[in-house]
Amino acid sequence: MTAKLIDGKAIAASLRQQIAKRVAERSQQGLRTPGLAVILVGSDPASQVYVSHKRKDCEEVGFISQAYDLPAETTQVALTNLIDRLNEDAAVDGILLQLPLPAHLDASLLLERIRPDKDVDGFHPYNVGRLAQRIPLLRPCTPKGIIALLESTGVDLYGLDAVVVGASNIVGRPMAMELLLAGCTVTVTHRFTKDLAGHVSRADLVVVAAGKPGLVKGEWIKPGAIVIDVGINRQDDGKLVGDVVYETALPRAGWITPVPGGVGPMTRACLLENTLYAAETLHD
């Protein structure tokens, strides 16, 4: 048996087409164009690449993209003032603060400063709390995108034993809440977990978001399980690999996401979807 690939690139492209169609319809109806403000502080190369992709995505679907490229020495006060200004700008439906930030800045305070109805990354405590209360509003982009990938398989998630490897605020914790909403029985593992292999080997569905290349071995995968690899790690030879040993997981899994081309494109597409939702549902 060889796993079926979950093509995040194709699914994300389809979602972007749907968003672009809706933006065009809004224009024909005389409604304003959704706007996304993207804030980049400093010159981290990976962040610069991510931000350029997000701006290109905005252009593709017809959004207005406001770019704020700030020097690394930007102060907490200056950044807070910018966020306050964007919060009050009626042309801005979403505010994206690219992480990580330089060490002297308090990311938690800045993310909380973004108005919850413009928090299209879904990181604000209000939006995370809504998800925990089972009344999601703006959902964290990566877990939201993963749910869309899982739905594309047609597999019924109700009652599945799911294991999330990694407990970050960005992926692991909100992912566990999304899977609970989807009807799974969820185990969250982390750096202190004993017998990670045992947990993974019992799982019908594994979501790996640890940021450690090759952490999950192919032989751990339960035959027929769904494997979602969120990790994206660059090796010394320049090759991008995930947190799962893909080559040995492929013959055991039922479904698997490739790296790259799996989760990453869906994260970006869901950012656009959240921005459109904010424009239409929260701001119009």
Curated annotation (Swiss-Prot):
NADP(+) binds at residues 166-168, 232. This is Bifunctional protein FolD 1. It comes from Pseudomonas syringae pv. tomato (strain ATCC BAA-871 / DC3000). Its EC number is 1.5.1.5, 3.5.4.9. Belongs to the tetrahydrofolate dehydrogenase/cyclohydrolase family. It catalyses: (6R)-5,10-methylene-5,6,7,8-tetrahydrofolate + NADP(+) = (6R)-5,10-methenyltetrahydrofolate + NADPH; (6R)-5,10-methenyltetrahydrofolate + H2O = (6R)-10-formyltetrahydrofolate + H(+). Gene3D superfamilies: Leucine Dehydrogenase, chain A, domain 1, NAD(P)-binding Rossmann-like Domain. Pfam families: THF_DHG_CYH (PF00763), THF_DHG_CYH_C (PF02882). It comes from the Bacteria. GO terms for cellular component: cytosol. The lineage of its organism: Bacteria, Pseudomonadati, Pseudomonadota, Gammaproteobacteria, Pseudomonadales. Keywords: Amino-acid biosynthesis, Histidine biosynthesis, Hydrolase, Methionine biosynthesis, Multifunctional enzyme, NADP, One-carbon metabolism, Oxidoreductase, Purine biosynthesis. NCBIfam families: PRK10792.1, PRK14186.1.
